[in-house]
């Protein structure tokens, strides 16, 4: 059923004029020569930027740019004023070919290559798009929608990390005070804030391992800090000779957790995000589910994988919903598919929820991963795959 | 003594090579010194065979065959003499099978009628199809976990046969890691490779038993310049920069243990590291092409480095891309694994794709059964894997679930057996 979900090419490319068009390269290896309708070949050299035709009909155009020079090159389709970038492709290494798909409206344009990635480029030439008679969807007020999506998501990230910091402080205090029952209650419910915005937290390379390393992630001799170190101490292994942390060790690891979370909190205050990051964040979160939570490998001591699972899914849904208006105009079918798949995954997760639907954040509860039957896990995994396939198409749908 | 053995074995190898060449087979590979004559296409691919006896064991610089059955054994609590007899029996059977013969003295349909056939028979009529059988010795053969010198060879354990360190992200399953002895059977027909392991396992009953074994298909490395670079299950070309048999100086430097290295009995041998690397196939398949190419550092189609050129163009790691960042990402697989990043460290990779059906969640249980040969793992595999485990962009899509290391002795002279020098005083 995958093909049924593929966005239509004409719709896919509509965004190229406005957005980050480096992603408008659906097929880097295609070597089709110009000739077919809408297919153009471009050869970029040190001095020139030859395009196989100077005119084309409006609608989807595929430029296949081959870098015949010896420097990294870029290709631009510029608007009538010769300044505004309608579409571009970057990072074409010497000898490499890459495609640029653009949905062109009738009008006058310029093509230009930029070998060496500096200066005004070479081989600037007029390029005319004539009216094919088939309407090309106007871009509308998309920039405003994009700005709104970015602003809203940044606010969401800040709110979640605020709550993460507060929760972490309470969790650390309970753990240090030896109030282990309270610490065990706060552990999964606080981590949900982290899981909801995990790709953002992970973008701070040094912090993520300090906060979230599992025992299996460690190299020989590497110090273990963060949530999972405390997890093992709160849910110690029953069989082997596990040595509980001393009071001094508890204080040290708890203080480190609060310190690292505080650093994360201050790091995200000035965060800049792009539409590209938003679109990929959603599938990134579902990959987290597929690689760790659905397999029960994230929380091997506490068994609280389903809290993390729910956090990841909620975070992905926030991202997808934030992009929904944009997606709706490009690919309404994809938008509807995502709605349905989110709903059915949430319904599957809700089967294992033990707290009331309106429970406060710190009272959210699920069954332990270890209590799931293998068919329960299979059903969850199937729903994750069902959602992740269409989710992985958001970026291409929005960015080309 | 050793020098004589090698002179004899090399002459022997050359004479066998002459026979094979007449059949259109690339020869000389067993001696590891000259390039295979890969331009000659065998009249009958099933008749392709490589000499078993020689200075080096076959199955290392031999052009990588299409299929693998890799088996690891634990040796029973037996006296040293029985271990030696096992190696002798294995050598004879392996030599026969590699030439298209039976595992035993009798053909599968011959021998005493009231006795079970010596050879199980499923390889009848298939031909040798390039079968090579390569033996190795694990650390636990020399020294048990409790330090016991099991077979009086603890003092002969090579320094290079280290216990591999724990790498970041390792999720090793003990049941498919380690082991006392290994046999790598490679052939162009899967049934021929399986037949070899099946019959060698049968010969071992009572002396050694199977600990785990792995089937592989679709070689993921080329070990000869005459071979097209194959693809791994990520859909990318793998092994482009591999050591090739046609570069004997590099093979001598990086693959074969020299007379002067540590333990003399290992001269002409190599060290094998195996890693079972599960790929997170489903998340990878949902990853956009731009990210796939960024993680690998090569184009998916031609396998050219992102810095340009064709597949065999050397990557230019300093070439800037947009935004001032290098065009080949700092954490790209090709950069981190490249000899330039690792003080010139190289190894001969000989891995295979695997699909062990699916797991309980309906996901393909698939990946790469990575095999590499080198003169010293502490200069090759270990530093490279340490670097990869730390920051390779591919780590998000892989997990290492099995691991082992073996000392692969030099080849046997006809009339002797594999590993004989380990047991000689």
Task: Report each predicted region and the residues it spans.
Chain B
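Long, histidine/aromatic-enriched segments associated with O2/redox biology
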Residues: 12-31, 39-425
């Amino acid at each position: 059923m995958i093909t049924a979900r593929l966005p239509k090419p004409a719709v896919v490319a509509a965004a190229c004029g406005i957005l980050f068009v480096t992603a408008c390269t659906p097929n880097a290896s295609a070597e089709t020569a110009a000739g077919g309708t809408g297919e153009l070949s471009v050869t970029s050299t040190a001095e020139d930027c030859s395009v196989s035709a100077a005119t084309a009909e409006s609608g989807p155009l595929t430029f296949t740019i081959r870098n015949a020079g010896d420097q990294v090159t870029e290709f631009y389709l510029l608007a009538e004023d010769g300044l505004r970038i309608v579409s571009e492709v970057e990072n074409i290494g010497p000898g490499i070919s890459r495609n640029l798909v653009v949905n062109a409206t009738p009008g006058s344009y310029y093509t230009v290559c930029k070998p060496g990635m500096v200066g005004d480029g070479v081989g600037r030439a007029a390029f005319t798009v004539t009216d094919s008679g088939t309407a090309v969807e106007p871009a509308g007020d998309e920039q405003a929608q994009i700005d709104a999506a970015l602003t809203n998501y940044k606010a969401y990230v800040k709110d979640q990390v605020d709550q993460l910091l507060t929760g972490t402080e309470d969790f650390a205090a309970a753990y240090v005070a030896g109030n282990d029952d309270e610490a065990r209650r706060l552990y999964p419910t606080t981590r949900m804030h982290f899981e909801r915005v995990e790709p953002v937290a992970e973008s701070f390379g040094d912090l993520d391992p300090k906060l979230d390393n599992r025992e299996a992630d460690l190299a020989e001799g590497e110090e273990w800090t963060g949530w999972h170190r405390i997890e093992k101490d709160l849910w110690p292994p029953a069989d082997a000779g596990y040595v509980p942390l001393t009071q001094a060790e508890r204080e040290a690891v708890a203080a480190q957790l609060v310190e690292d979370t505080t650093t994360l909190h201050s790091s995200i205050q000035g965060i800049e995000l792009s539409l590209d990051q938003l679109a990929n964040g959603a599938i990134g979160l579902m990959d987290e589910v597929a690689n760790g939570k659905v397999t029960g490998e994230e929380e091997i001591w506490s068994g609280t994988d389903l809290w993390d699972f729910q956090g990841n899914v909620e975070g992905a849904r926030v991202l997808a919903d934030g992009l929904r208006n944009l997606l709706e105009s490009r690919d309404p079918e994809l938008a509807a598919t995502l709605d349905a798949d989110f709903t059915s995954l949430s319904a599957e997760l809700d089967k294992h929820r033990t707290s009331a639907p309106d429970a406060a954040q710190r009272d959210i509860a699920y069954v332990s991963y270890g209590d799931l039957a293998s068919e329960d896990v299979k059903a969850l995994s199937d729903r994750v795959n069902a959602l992740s396939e269409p989710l992985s198409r958001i970026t291409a749908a929005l960015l080309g | 003594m050793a020098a004589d053995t090698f002179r004899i074995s090399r002459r022997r190898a050359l004479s066998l090579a002459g026979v094979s060449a007449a059949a259109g087979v690339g020869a000389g590979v067993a001696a590891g010194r000259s390039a295979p004559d890969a331009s000659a296409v065998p009249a009958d691919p099933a008749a392709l065979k490589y000499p078993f006896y020689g200075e080096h064991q076959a199955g290392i610089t031999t052009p990588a065959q299409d299929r693998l059955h890799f088996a690891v054994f634990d040796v029973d609590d037996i006296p040293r003499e029985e271990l030696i007899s096992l190696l002798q029996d294995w050598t004879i059977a392996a030599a026969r099978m590699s030439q298209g013969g039976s595992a035993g003295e009798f053909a599968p349909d011959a021998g005493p009628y009231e006795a079970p056939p010596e050879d199980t028979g499923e390889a009848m009529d298939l031909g040798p199809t390039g079968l090579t059988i390569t033996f190795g010795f694990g650390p636990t053969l020399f020294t048990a976990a409790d330090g016991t010198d099991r077979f009086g060879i603890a003092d002969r354990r090579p320094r290079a046969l280290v216990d591999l360190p724990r790498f970041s992200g390792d999720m090793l399953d003990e049941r498919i890691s380690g082991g006392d002895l290994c046999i790598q059977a490679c052939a162009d027909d899967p049934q021929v490779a399986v037949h070899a392991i099946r019959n060698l396992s049968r010969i071992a009953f009572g002396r050694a038993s199977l600990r785990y074994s792995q089937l592989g298909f679709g070689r993921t490395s080329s070990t000869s310049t005459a071979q097209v670079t194959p693809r791994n299950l990520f859909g990318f070309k793998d092994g482009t920069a591999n050591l090739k048999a046609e570069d004997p100086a590099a093979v001598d430097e990086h693959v074969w243990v020299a007379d002067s290295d540590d333990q003399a009995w290992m001269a002409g041998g190599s060290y094998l590291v195996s890693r079972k690397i599960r790929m997170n196939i489903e998340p990878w398949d949902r990853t956009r092409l731009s990210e796939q190419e960024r993680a690998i550092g090569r184009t998916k189609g031609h396998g050219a480095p992102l810095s340009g050129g064709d597949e065999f163009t050397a990557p230019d790691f300093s070439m800037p891309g947009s935004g001032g960042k290098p065009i080949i990402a700092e954490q790209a697989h090709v950069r981190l694994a490249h000899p330039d990043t690792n003080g010139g460290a190289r190894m001969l990779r000989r891995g295979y794709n695997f699909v062990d059906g699916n797991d309980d969640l309906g996901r393909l249980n698939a990946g790469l059964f990575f095999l590499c040969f080198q003169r010293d793992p502490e200069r090759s595999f270990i530093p490279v894997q340490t670097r990869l485990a730390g920051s390779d962009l591919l780590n998000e899509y892989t997990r290492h679930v099995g691991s082992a290391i073996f000392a692969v002795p030099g080849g046997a002279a006809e009339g002797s057996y594999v590993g004989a020098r380990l047991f000689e005083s």
